[in-house]
Amino acid sequence: VLFAGDGGLQMTIQELGTIFQSKIPVKIVLLNNSFLGMVRQWQELFYDRRYSFTEMVNPDFGLIARGNGLSYRCVERREELDEAIAAMKASEGAFLLEVRVEGEENIFPMVPAGAPVSEIRFE
């Protein structure tokens, strides 16, 4: 199972073609917050929310997934998640599960750039 953000997936989206061509049954959970999430998080935590070039207008990931031979499902509410995960697990081939999440939800823990692991941040 691959967990990826929408920004990260778009940087390597051509690999969906490799998955299709090679018939790799990978399961992808796409955490879509419509931001370059880690960059936005840094700008929030270390630069007083002075956001620059982090908000994204995303393509239709369902069309892209299906166009590359992957099954696809989109979750917009927490209540839909269990059923969508079950569908993904039951799928024999490659599957893209898009989970739309809050735009300013942060990912922790994280280690600031240049800092030792002992300075890990949990909030």
Predicted regions span which residues?
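Thiamine diphosphate
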Residues: 1-123
